[in-house]
Each structure stands twice: as structure tokens, then as C-alpha cells.
């Protein structure tokens, strides 16, 4: 039962945070949002590795949902740096990479958890922090200041994502 709660809360936080992070990346650039999300995710995995109670793991999953919401920013980054004729292919590669990650991640987590239940969190923290360092040193900004827009809570409202569902309700 708790596994379902943990998964639902992660997805709910990602749903709420995705449009906010997207709007922040439109305002401040893709790079800072991606960097802060990777840093936050790395620190969050450390929190979960050290969590003394189930409650702390729950807090960690909430934070993880927010920081994982930067996927929209990653897709925006790819849209910024690829030509329109290569964009669909690039999005397909990203989708495949995420799919492979969702297959390999739990399997690797199971192997690592057999060694220690906290080891998967430490390894995930290492990957996230390595991604942060890579981005800090190598990742250029893809969204130039002249293309940035003001932050708008109206655009960042996650309820607005549900609006297209009205097409199916009569």
C-alpha cells in the first residue's frame, strides 16, 4: 500500500511542478533549472539514503517529484538546440532513453538493494550529482535572454494542463 502512496505522491508533485519549472526556464533559461534540479535530486537522494523513518522517505519522494519535473525543461532544451527537421528524432531518442532508464533503474536498484537497502539511494545521488557537475562545466545555455518571457503563474498553473480533457467531456 505504501508503495502506491509513494508513487502517487511523486507523480502528483511532478504534475504540479512541471509547468512551474517550465515557466521558470522560459524566464531564467534552461540551464539554471536543469542544474538546480540535478543538484536538488542528488541532495534528495542523500536525504533518502540517510532517512531514519518512513516519513523522511516520504518527504524525499515529494522533493524527488518536484526535481524530476525538470523533464519538461530537458525537452525544451532539446527543442532549442535541434533543427525542426531533427526534433522528432531527438525527442524519440530522449523518450527511448527514459524508457530504458525505467527498465534498467529498478533492476539495478534491486541488485544494489541486495547489498544494502540504502545503496540504491547513494548510487542515484552519485549519478545526479555527476550530472550536475557535468552540466555546470559543460552544458551551455540554450535559451538566449532575448527569447525569454516573464514568469506567469497563469502559464505555470498545473490545472491548465487538464483543459484539453474538456474536449472529451460532453
Locations of the language-model features?
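Helix-loop junctions at membrane interfaces in 12-TM secondary transporters
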Residues: 47-60
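Helix-breaking motifs and short loop linkers at transmembrane-helix boundaries and internal kinks
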Residues: 29, 50-52, 67
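Structural signature of the two symmetry-related core transmembrane helices
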Residues: 32-47
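MFS-fold secondary transporters
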Residues: 44-48, 64, 135
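Residue-level signature of mid-helix packing/kink "hotspots" within the transmembrane helices
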Residues: 11-19, 69, 102-103
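Juxtamembrane intracellular "pre-TM" segments in multi-pass secondary transporters
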Residues: 142-170
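Cytoplasmic helix-loop-helix junction between adjacent transmembrane helices
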Residues: 60-99
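Helix-loop-helix hairpin linking two adjacent transmembrane segments in secondary transporters
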Residues: 97-137
Amino acid at each position: 500500500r505504501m508503495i502506491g502512496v509513494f508513487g502517487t505522491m511523486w507523480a502528483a508533485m511532478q504534475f504540479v511542478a512541471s509547468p512551474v519549472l517550465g515557466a521558470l526556464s522560459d524566464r531564467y533559461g534552461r540551464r539554471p533549472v536543469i542544474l538546480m534540479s540535478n543538484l536538488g535530486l542528488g541532495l534528495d537522494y542523500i536525504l533518502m539514503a540517510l532517512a531514519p523513518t518512513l516519513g523522511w522517505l516520504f518527504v524525499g519522494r515529494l522533493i524527488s517529484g518536484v526535481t524530476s519535473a525538470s523533464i519538461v525543461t530537458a525537452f525544451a532544451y532539446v527543442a532549442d538546440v535541434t533543427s525542426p527537421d531533427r526534433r522528432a528524432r531527438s525527442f524519440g531518442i530522449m523518450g527511448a532513453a527514459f524508457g530504458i532508464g525505467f527498465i534498467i533503474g529498478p533492476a539495478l536498484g534491486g541488485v544494489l538493494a541486495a547489498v544494502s537497502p540504502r545503496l540504491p539511494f547513494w548510487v542515484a545521488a552519485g549519478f545526479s550529482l555527476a550530472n550536475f557537475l557535468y552540466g555546470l562545466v559543460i552544458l551551455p545555455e540554450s535559451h538566449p535572454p532575448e527569447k525569454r518571457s516573464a514568469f506567469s503563474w497563469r502559464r505555470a498553473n498545473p490545472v491548465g494542463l487538464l483543459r484539453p480533457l474538456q474536449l472529451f467531456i460532453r
